[in-house]
Amino acid sequence: MILDTDYITEDGKPVIRIFKKENGEFKIEYDRTFEPYFYALLKDDSAIEEVKKITAERHGTVVTVKRVEKVQKKFLGRPVEVWKLYFTHPQDVPAIRDKIREHPAVIDIYEYDIPFAKRYLIDKGLVPMEGDEELKMLAFDIETLYHEGEEFAEGPILMISYADEEGARVITWKNVDLPYVDVVSTEREMIKRFLRVVKEKDPDVLITYNGDNFDFAYLKKRCEKLGINFALGRDGSEPKIQRMGDRFAVEVKGRIHFDLYPVIRRTINLPTYTLEAVYEAVFGQPKEKVYAEEITTAWETGENLERVARYSMEDAKVTYELGKEFLPMEAQLSRLIGQSLWDVSRSSTGNLVEWFLLRKAYERNELAPNKPDEKELARRRQSYEGGYVKEPERGLWENIVYLDFRCHPADTKVVVKGKGIINISEVQEGDYVLGIDGWQRVRKVWEYDYKGELVNINGLKCTPNHKLPVVTKNERQTRIRDSLAKSFLTKKVKGKIITTPLFYEIGRATSENIPEEEVLKGELAGILLAEGTLLRKDVEYFDSSRKKRRISHQYRVEITIGKDEEEFRDRITYIFERLFGITPSISEKKGTNAVTLKVAKKNVYLKVKEIMDNIESLHAPSVLRGFFEGDGSVNRVRRSIVATQGTKNEWKIKLVSKLLSQLGIPHQTYTYQYQENGKDRSRYILEITGKDGLILFQTLIGFISERKNALLNKAISQREMNNLENNGFYRLSEFNVSTEYYEGKVYDLTLEGTPYYFANGILTHNSLYPSIIITHNVSPDTLNREGCKEYDVAPQVGHRFCKDFPGFIPSLLGDLLEERQKIKKKMKATIDPIERKLLDYRQRAIKILANSILPEEWLPVLEEGEVHFVRIGELIDRMMEENAGKVKREGETEVLEVSGLEVPSFNRRTKKAELKRVKALIRHDYSGKVYTIRLKSGRRIKITSGHSLFSVRNGELVEVTGDELKPGDLVAVPRRLELPERNHVLNLVELLLGTPEEETLDIVMTIPVKGKKNFFKGMLRTLRWIFGEEKRPRTARRYLRHLEDLGYVRLKKIGYEVLDWDSLKNYRRLYEALVENVRYNGNKREYLVEFNSIRDAVGIMPLKELKEWKIGTLNGFRMSPLIEVDESLAKLLGYYVSEGYARKQRNPKNGWSYSVKLYNEDPEVLDDMERLASRFFGKVRRGRNYVEIPKKIGYLLFENMCGVLAENKRIPEFVFTSPKGVRLAFLEGYFIGDGDVHPNKRLRLSTKSELLANQLVLLLNSVGVSAVKLGHDSGVYRVYINEELPFVKLDKKKNAYYSHVIPKEVLSEVFGKVFQKNVSPQTFRKMVEDGRLDPEKAQRLSWLIEGDVVLDRVESVDVEDYDGYVYDLSVEDNENFLVGFGLVYAHNSYYGYYGYARARWYCKECAESVTAWGREYITMTIKEIEEKYGFKVIYSDTDGFFATIPGADAETVKKKAMEFLKYINAKLPGALELEYEGFYKRGFFVTKKKYAVIDEEGKITTRGLEIVRRDWSEIAKETQARVLEALLKDGDVEKAVRIVKEVTEKLSKYEVPPEKLVIHEQITRDLKDYKATGPHVAVAKRLAARGVKIRPGTVISYIVLKGSGRIGDRAIPFDEFDPTKHKYDAEYYIENQVLPAVERILRAFGYRKEDLRYQKTRQVGLSAWLKPKGT
């Protein structure tokens, strides 16, 4: 039996060690032959020599590839050739892998992250824990001396206890007279004795409880202090302590260190995980707890040492018993996974699945996919609809049964770009195949074995469930629908199939092996035809050396292109370098956006001239590619390819047309005649239209640049498949069908884009859950695989899975499913709920959590670069309502993928602030506990139990869920934020367009006549001419130049080119509105137009034109519609938001008057307000304490940007993204207007607006101010600032805020010693420089000094029940965002193995197909049992349902259920099987996944109900148990209600024994770290004040007394309760213990909380609920 493996280094080479137990003896085997390696996939095998030369450095040693080997592997089922690269040492791999991956010839590298010893187990097929060896186990535990404030391991170890099959003993160094105690002289001797015991007993397994994080570390520290060699390994080595996440893990070489704590934490849900609590939960027996202070007291006084020794012995004994209980399951898991028990017991479920698949992949010669990087992770985090859940039939039911459930042959021809017509079996991932839209990239190639019938349709052979599109027509429309191949055999398919007559022509053309030189010559000729010139010039000059005149013959080749056409420029350069060995010079053409590439060499000129003279004999596709890249464009409006030439170049268009005709590409040419400067001109246009022409161009020619190819692909996808009978690319064909038998490989392709491609010239379509995976062969390598005989198609989602051979995952799941069934049988046999949970854990691979935020939380979000503050619930609800058709559902979770949204976030590695894209919005229906987390700074956030904030552990930020956060914890908040910064221009037109039309009735726009006379009409005539509707105006050139300035057209030497037809069309609409509505205002020599008359068009006016206009009221003030947002405007806005007021009121003439007032008592401030207001709004009024802007335009501006009332004031959104000076100016104006200096010298900003308070925090963070606190009193929010701001100086020293210190707890955790106070960054640096702090450890905290994140302390955590929607975001890369009042960093949400985004074999299509089949089978089965067998289904979830026959007795229900099973299982396919899971006498169902049932043996099973926890009072537990029994055992709802009323009555009359009211809660941290004082903390603090030692782990047992004031003040230790003096608080126990324990259960029967109290007893009309519905 293999226990473990590792490796050591000998002479620089690795040696594998295998620790084994064989025939009862321990042995170590060595393997010196195994070499580290990984795989590399190369573009070209010739590059392997370059790869072999790559070097790196590791600790001064040069790392190289030792040797290489070419191997045949499969990647997702598809054969692939890769290079296996071997190295000298395992540590060489991480040193060199990135350099190899970055080599341009390397496509990717694989399996580089598998640890060497684990790799050895996989490659050699070795399975740990396999065999029948009996393992010797030894458990141990230590007791230590501790005084409050001491550093870890400062106190000595007092006792070491150990236990094995022979019993338990204790070693100590004080005299204790007990038979199982061995007494030695000193602590040193005690440890040496223990080491001797381990050596003599030589256990294979060392069992601890939290030994990873306590016992071993303590022993190691004490051994170092006492000079003891802590040798526990069988090779004489000391235990190896290594970090594993935020915890530690300890290895003992040659022995299995089995730490029970991580195993139990992941398998059993308990309120506390003390050894005592776990032992009682597992074995049902109590165990005495002796607290640390009691141990210390006993040791120092010598009294009660026997009790401590007994406690120590029992610790070792129960640890041994727990080890025996849990080790067999972990050993079984180790055998299944194929990795060591040490690894398996500390691994997450996802990692276990991964290691299992890695081993199986190697066995099947499959190359393992790489783990996703952060970018791929973000792409994967998408949701899909979950399993079917039927809403329950509420009430009490009898005689219930529960039933539950157990996916183109190789010579098919396809056209591949660059390869021509090949067999589908030869296609590789990354190839481009001929599809419905031309070339489409192959994402995956699937290969399977198949044996069975193929359907032959016109020569295309496919499996029966393969789909082909079929076209049917009637008088009105053409319809294209997919039909299964097997349907063609039934003659039910009416219509024609789609083929292409060009299949073989395109295949032949793309397969032509044209030499690169011919391709380059053709492209060069086409480029010169479009954009080039050949220049030959004779220049006479005087040769001074020879004293005579000479002639210089100059030859030059020039090509002029756009400056931004980088790909085109690079291609031209490449052509000249490859053909002529010369690099062209590049120069910019002044005043243009063009560059010219030049070569001035005679020999090059002559060669190029020869090429051009023979252009028609060159490779036509290459010539056309060059020409269209230079002079062609994709017209986005017409979705066509257009090339245009001027008057003298008709021959070029004719030549291009001739070449296109040779290739069979349909096109049109036409001539456009016009006059320019009195001369007749012609423009010759060639256009390729229609989907057929575009596809032929794309497949046979294509563009050079990716940009133009992308535009072409988009145009193709937007083109409809019209006129299929008369089409250059598609044809409609009748079909003939037959069948034949086939045995062999079948293939499928997964494509990017539309899932159709041509095969043989015919267009072709591209738990319960484990059982479905096996039945339907659901696997990444069977998904949408072309060429199979048979497919299973997932309902609704339409993904196809090849059935011709077993997929990688399904074939493995068969074994797992069999194992699962064995486990389920054991689960049925056990009556122990803990064992059930443990076994249930083993059959699950993934647990999906709903982690969310409450709807009212504030969220800053950037949309198109603008900052918005919204309630997270309002944002997500609105967007999901607006995009209802795009919302995906996964069970109770709704997901909407979005674009254009960003949120502030921090980089998890650097802790720097960043903006990150929001991938999806998430909404989840939730019922359960929610936690309001309040921070010391005044921030607060409300989250569900599973949602995470970021807290610090061992110097690193880690995710901590809501139910784990406690007062005193430190959580991440922003120090500073990086927002996009740019100069803004306030556009009043856009602002006014957002106001109601009635508000802009008297708003006008004006422009001076000068320079604009007749301009509007002239421009409109020119635009109509451009669109071919009028003759060319005489003055067209003037307007064309204006259009060129605006970027709509480009003028040429002759004529012009329209750059953007869509925008030009909109611009024309603007001028049609202006010409119709502009009038001349002679008094002011201006043109005037009413704003509302052009409201529909004015928004598209170019800014260059808009800045010439004025805007305002007809008879009043007008101003520029474009206002630069500078510091003056920002300060004015700050004044307004703080103490401004905008007013609209009726005037004496029954009209409206508008004004804006800015208030202040300081004359100097009023002077500044007046100066700023008059700058923007002209003349203003000055009052005693105000400045008034009596302008409507001013009112509209301030109202729309900033709000009116104090409660709805806000910061204009553009302020956040303005330059820092502008943001500071706003803050200065705000501070002067509504700020003050608090008596403690803090700056204070005040507002009644909660939104504004949050905005102020964000704005302050954006200028680097982090010392912010928030308060709220008398309806006013206060923002306190403890930093200097540029506009205010304070002379008093301030107390440091959280953002200015490193918390002492963090320092203690990192440096391992006690710090008495927090430390400033300056002091911290000095301590490091002075050598007082370890620099290496200090580096772990560098992010707290240099990063953009600081720590804020949790002050209180309040818990409440919640029913409703909760919300979350999926954020790219960083997985966090800012949310909550005052802004807190929250972790974003994660969404069995297929859907796990971090999985190597991730497959979203597989996951959603499995759930789709699940929904189909469960709904079909429910329909069958109800309609044919008379059952009523009461409740169902994803993989089973509860049903009964109303009125039938138990035996009838059982009999009919068995008959139905026989019937339905004959109909269900494959491994799917409906099972008889159990019969229940009675049950009730509350809501989804919340129910309780009782079986025939009286065993009650509950799911999802609020079952009381172990730390609730006995009266609550007892009442709930009695209520469940009354409902389920007696079937009596009235009795259940009576029980509750009786208990509440007894409580009210003080008739309940006090011992039933004791509440037990555990202290989880040092008392000084508790800021919020719950009852147990209040009691603990009072005990501590009396000298009682309280440590983390201490359980406080208390009772709450009647009285006034806080509950904590009325809670006392139970042993102090005196019935003669004290009365318990009956109301507290009723409201907080008894009613919560039963309320949710009885709510299912129509009862409310008030109905259950004896004081409010009343009859309710609930007779329908009171009788069992099954009777």
Curated annotation (Swiss-Prot):
Domain DOD-type homing endonuclease: 524-665, 1132-1265
Intrachain S-S bonds: 788-802, 1403-1406
Reaction equations catalysed: DNA(n) + a 2'-deoxyribonucleoside 5'-triphosphate = DNA(n+1) + diphosphate
Biotechnological applications: Pyrococcus kodakaraensis enzyme is a very fast, thermostable DNA polymerase (130 nucleotides/s) used in high-performance PCR.
Region feature (3'-5' exonuclease): 135-326
GO BP annotations, alphabetical order: DNA-templated DNA replication; intein-mediated protein splicing; intron homing
PANTHER family attached to this UniProt entry: DNA POLYMERASE CATALYTIC SUBUNIT (PTHR10322), DNA POLYMERASE DELTA CATALYTIC SUBUNIT (PTHR10322:SF23)
Protein name listed in UniProt: DNA polymerase
